Amino acid sequence: MMNKMFSQFSRRKFLGAAGATTLLSSARGFGAYASSLNNSASDGVPASSGKGRIVDMHVHFDAKKPNYIEDFLKVSERLNLTALMLTPFENRKVVAEAAKQHPTRIVPFGYVDLYAPDVVQQVEELHSMGFRGLGELEFVKKPYIDPNYFPVYERANEYGWVVLFHTGIVLRAKFNEPEDVASGRMRPIHLEEIARRFPKITVLGAHCGNPEYQWAAEIARWNSNVFFDLSGSSLTKMQRRLSTFREIFWWTGEGDSQVKTPDNDPNAFVKIVFGSDTSLEGIENVIKQYHALFDACEVPEPTRNRIMGGTLINLLGLPG
């Protein structure tokens, strides 16, 4: 578990540094969004209200930082941001208590060792403590659709939970020794079967299957309970060709391509939700990257609002 946490921290630190060097061109898009938040405040709407609120589906609790919750709350207040805080099982009490004290800022999610003999009991305990879902599931030894994982999915289905899965390429943490890790076990195509077998689970895929964006998008298109984020390296490596995503999220949701979407939004990009997967200092840069994508792909304002928070607010029934 410690190796896993180290890998996650290293990845977020690296991606945060990489993204920070590529975002000057997108500052204008975020500036407009930030202005809308300021206008909301001037209209007498408190920062903790749902108006203009960002919901970040991909914030990893960092147990190595004793002031992490306090530091997060400062960022949360400044950006008007709520986090689905992905929490190691051993840190569940800290985050559960923080979520009780700050219900409009922290939504507790737990990740468990799928190979622990008491993993189902761990899931049940998280549920009893008020956790709202699982994530980020990753570094699995078998594909996500392996029946050995089904008892966990069955509990999540029973609870109507949201479950976040890593999808796509994954970093390599060890170079001089064998490592039982393979991206092929975490391909986005596996999420289709989970979504169909367990229809009460809302399936979130991190990183939009990087680099299998086409598979991720088509699975999200035909499964109303599947969404993806674009955290990680995608918006950095695609910064000069962001409009390419219009060819991936291509459908209109009308006519022969009509599918069930949040609020019947016909824009294909509504199947994306915001996720940062970076350090606290890097979240604002990822927001800018999303807005650069919106501008490049001419995503309409109502769809932008759903991506940045509206969809998850409705799915989770978050307080205002």
Residue spans of the language-model regions?
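Active-site gating/metal-coordination segments in enzymes
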Residues: 90-185, 234-235
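Histidine/acidic-residue-rich catalytic or RNA/ligand-binding cores of hydrolases
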Residues: 65-69, 95, 173-177, 213-222, ...
